[in-house]
Regions:
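Acidic surface patches and DE-rich sequence motifs
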Residues: 4, 149, 229-230
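Short, conserved, GDST-rich strand-edge loop motifs in beta-rich repeat architectures
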Residues: 176-186
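Short linear sequence signals and composition-biased patches located at protein termini or domain-edge surfaces
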Residues: 42-46, 50-100, 104, 111, ...
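Autoprocessing Asn-cyclization modules and mimics
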Residues: 82-178
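Aliphatic-rich helix starts adjacent to a transmembrane/signal segment
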Residues: 2-59, 63-65, 261, 279-280
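Residue-level preference for short coil/turn positions at secondary-structure junctions
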Residues: 6, 141, 243-246
Length: 280
């Protein structure tokens, strides 16, 4: 009587092992491919998010440059001696701060939030209590302020702040609410804003009102500014007349931190921003 053996033979086991290795190899290859795709997408997403935040903040400062809470036609009194901040607002609301051409940008403007006044002298203003209950919530001693109406503006420094009153120096030629060329209801007070945008290392930084720089985005490997003057169709890093600048082109290169196939993800961005005080 013949005995029949059942089960796997050596050859069958070897074939099964080879097939298993092939399946495992294919699965590992798919895993590696997915991992590389994830790293590439993650790096690109971070770059795009950094660029979005950077351009949003830079654009806000450039658009506001040269502007106040009042008319763009407002000017200090003709007999008033301009200080450095007033001169900057009038003649160079955007500039390169004397740095190497195209490497830095400085923008000056009034703050976005401005407050109405109900009374004024040549060295103080009384704020509208229906708009702000305590002036200390908005201003502090040493703040640079813009006082303006539809006809004039001045940049002053706060010397004292109480519940409803802000005192300042230097004194204005006349009380802002008795200007015969502008109604008292148009008088506003806001903080003066001076910002400097620059690159340090691989970071994009902003310094506000002379304070230490704060990093806005990392991975910024290149940053440049170019300016278009009124009546021109070209952009240049060295404009011949800062008062005539009406738009700024911001070029930025961002590089990710993750490597894919031994290469880092890098993208170039460019955006053009107009100065509202010069174009509206």
């Amino acid at each position: 009587m013949r005995t029949t053996q059942s089960g796997f033979g050596l050859i069958e086991l070897m074939i099964a092992m080879v097939l298993g290795l092939l399946v495992m190899g294919a699965a590992f290859a798919v895993f590696q491919s997915n991992q590389r795709s994830f790293q590439a997408n993650e790096g690109l997403n971070r770059i795009q998010e950094s660029a979005r935040v950077a351009y949003e903040l830079i654009s806000r400062d450039i658009r506001a440059a040269g502007g106040t809470a009042c008319s763009n036609l407002a000017r200090p009194d003709a007999e008033h001696t301009l200080n450095a901040d007033e001169t900057q607002l009038l003649t160079a609301p955007v500039s390169d701060n004397g740095a190497a051409a195209g490497t830095e940008l400085v923008a000056a403007s009034g703050d976005d939030t401005a407050y109405r006044i109900t009374g004024a002298t040549t060295n103080s203003v009384t704020l509208d209590s229906t708009q702000i209950a305590d002036a200390n919530d908005a201003f502090k001693v040493g703040d640079k302020l813009i006082l303006c109406n539809a006809n004039q503006f001045y940049v002053v420094t706060a010397t004292a702040v109480s519940t409803n009153t802000v005192s300042f120096s230097p004194a204005t030629p006349v009380a802002m609410n008795v200007d015969p060329m502008a109604p008292p209801a148009t008088v506003m007070v806001a903080r003066f804003r001076n910002v400097r945008w620059y690159r340090s290392g691989n970071g994009l930084y902003v310094s506000r009102n002379g304070a230490a720089g704060q990093q806005v985005a990392d991975g910024v490997t290149a940053l440049s500014f170019a300016y278009r003057q009124n009546g021109s169709n070209t952009y240049t890093a060295t404009p011949t007349s800062w008062p005539d600048v009406v738009a700024v082109r911001v070029n930025m290169t961002l590089t990710g931190t993750n490597q894919v196939d031994n290469k880092t993800v890098s993208r170039n961005f460019s955006n053009v921003i107009s100065l509202r005080s010069r174009t509206l």
